[in-house]
Every structure is written in structure tokens, then in C-alpha cells.
Amino acid sequence: MNDFHKIANEIARIPDENLSWEERLNELVKFRAYLKEYYDSYGEDYLSFLERIEKEDDLEEKYILEYDFKKEVLSKDYNLDGLNYLLVNILFKYKLAIEDYNEYVNLLKEKYDVELKADWEKILSEKDLDLLEALSLLTFLQRSDYWDYEHMPFSYAIFDGTVDKILESIENHIDEENIEFLEIFVKE
């Protein structure tokens, strides 16, 4: 498997270029190949955990299962930590982190009525989000690591496929009309 920490450091050393929005978004979407490599390496422990958590109906029990798994397994996963670091580097290197992400995420939560749902980020990732919505949700997840590091929101979103679904939305909306809309609302 690739050393994702090393790749992240290599990306950070690339001289800044004046790339178009489309080129920058395509650089972000390339991250999906690294996700696939990581997912293909899942051991039986990971797969059985995902199945178990999907089947759990009791929200409190689900929360405990997730927390224990994050603490005992994911926090020690060097490759997942590397993916997290790599994605953060890509977001900042290519200036794809949305400054007003909270505003857009709150509008999204209202739009899809997910305010009180515990796994609202995962639910939103399964929607057909436009570029601004998808980048805002991705930025929200990345920034949430700062105030809730113990619960590993960004790493867990990478692990459980939420980030991949967001990137799929981005990939599906890289076109002239969506990019023009993004340029209007995002300050560089």
C-alpha cells in the first residue's frame, strides 16, 4: 500500500500553480483512488465491524460500538491517519476548503431535514450534492476534527465511506455551470 503520509508531504512541496477550478477539483477527485486502495486493504475486523454497526438499531449501543472501535482500532491505523493527512493537504494546497462552510451546511441540514439525526453527515453524503454543498460538507467534516478530535469525525468519515460519497458528488458535478456557480460564491 502507498505511504499516504509521504504522498501528502510530496503534494505540500509542489510549487503553487494558478490552476483552474476544474483542475483543482480533479486533483481532489483523484483522492478516490487512494480511498479504494485503503478500502481494498480492509481486514476482516473492519468489515465485520461495518456490518455490525449497520445492523445496530439502538442508537446508544451504536454510539458505544463506534467509540470503542475508533479508540481501539482506528486510532492506531497508520494508513487511515495518512489518508486524513493527505486529504487535508489536498484541500488546503488546492484552496478547496470553503470559508463559509457552516452557513452552507446549515442550509443543507434544513433542506434535507436532518437536524436531529445522529448520523446526518452520512445521510447528506448520500444525496446528490452540488459542488458548493459537497465542498462545504467536506470542509465541515475536516474542521470538526479540531473541536472533536477524540471522536475522529474526519477519519471515521473516510473509513465509513462518507468522504467517498461526497467526492463522488463532486466528480459528478464538475461541469461549466456548476464551476461558474462555485466561482460566484467562493472567495479565493
Regions found by a protein language model. Give the residues of each.
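Amphipathic alpha-helical elements of HEAT/ARM-like alpha-solenoid repeat scaffolds that form extended
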Residues: 27, 65, 86-88, 137-141, ...
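Intrinsically disordered, low-complexity linker/tail regions enriched in Pro/Ser/Thr
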Residues: 74, 78-116
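Acidic, low-complexity, intrinsically disordered interaction modules
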Residues: 45-47, 53-82, 129-156
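Alpha-helix capping and inter-helical loop/turn segments
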Residues: 40, 95-99, 112-114, 128-129, ...
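Short, charge/polar-rich alpha-helical segments
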Residues: 120-132
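Amphipathic alpha-helical binding modules
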Residues: 140, 144-187
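Short terminal alpha-helical segments
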Residues: 2-47, 68, 84, 88-92, ...
